[in-house]
């Protein structure tokens, strides 16, 4: 090699960039547990106060603010799914591909809990982690939603696709994004 010093410098730059990206990905992934907990506690509290109908109202009115509150340091936090209830949460092309990959892997027997995907897409660091359908979710998202609740869901979400799930199935994913270079180093 004619330019060993240049090669070494380039290698260090690439290594530093990879470490910086890994740090950003870890930073984003670290936001998910608190967001998940806050969302779950809000929905469970609404269920205790007024049953599934109150939980549907809480999801519709409070969930967007909870997502916004958990976005920090340039991160935007949200949820998406292949079968959405709220059309505002529909996946973009990359999210759809990741969700389909999560679904294939789960179908092949890989546990959802161990999955995560992170990439740089169009100048943004993107992170997704799957959401498994939990037992409490089945009242509104399961295979046997009570008729009165189903009517309420149709009133609030005329294009609802988010039913028919079984416990443990892929319900959707947490999705996070932030600019790769936002001027913070």
Give the positions of each predicted feature:
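Sec/Tat signal peptide C-region and signal peptidase I cleavage site
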Residues: 14-18
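Extracytoplasmic c-type cytochrome modules immediately beyond a signal peptide or single-pass transmembrane anchor
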Residues: 19-133, 148-185
